[in-house]
Amino acid sequence: MALKILFWGTPGYAVPTLDALHDAGHRIVAVVTQPDRRRGRGKQLIPSAVKTRALELDLPVYTPEKIRRDLSCQQQLADLGADLSVVVAFGQILPPEVLFQPPLGCWNGHGSLLPRWRGAGPIQWSILEGDVQTGVGVMAMEEGLDTGPVLIERALAIGLLENAHQLGERLSQLTAELMVEALPLIESAGPGPEDERHRRLGLRPQRQDVTYARMINKSDYQLDWTGSALAIHRKVMA
């Protein structure tokens, strides 16, 4: 059955999932993304990749500066009557009023094998730290940062000569595939109390060996020429 989905995402990484949900016949009731930002030498306002794609698909778009504080936007989104929210790299922390509003929950496609690399930069940190594999998980969202139990996940190997852009392309496609795969499972659990829905779905709680992937900054890319060739290679790839 086609589900009514509220989609949250911002960068190009999230576009394949938006496309996949649309192509699968689900009804995207609206897309929520970050506001246009000034970029480039001319400081022109540039829309996010997700906004650009949503407009091409003729979907309603909301661009709250801070969804936590925008009570009007929260109410407008609630009034759309979505069955669930799908979140892929949105870029803001969602408040409880948003997380727990849809009857089938709020679900996130995350580019790592949780609990390794919770946070904003899992792709870059998996390369910087020399991980041999990473993956994608679809998890039920909680108030904590990437702390929710996992519904489904899939691993993939990281190539020695694979850079962050290339790895991100593969992970974004895998995220789209897994989210489409997850939706019938989520629907089968039906609405009701969150703990009961999660029990019916058999979600996997995250283990205790947690690592965090903070946002990469310019200093992280400074090369230390006294370091090993492998460490330098990883920084270049990330």
Question: Positions of the model-derived regions?
Answer:
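One-carbon transfer enzymes
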Residues: 1-238
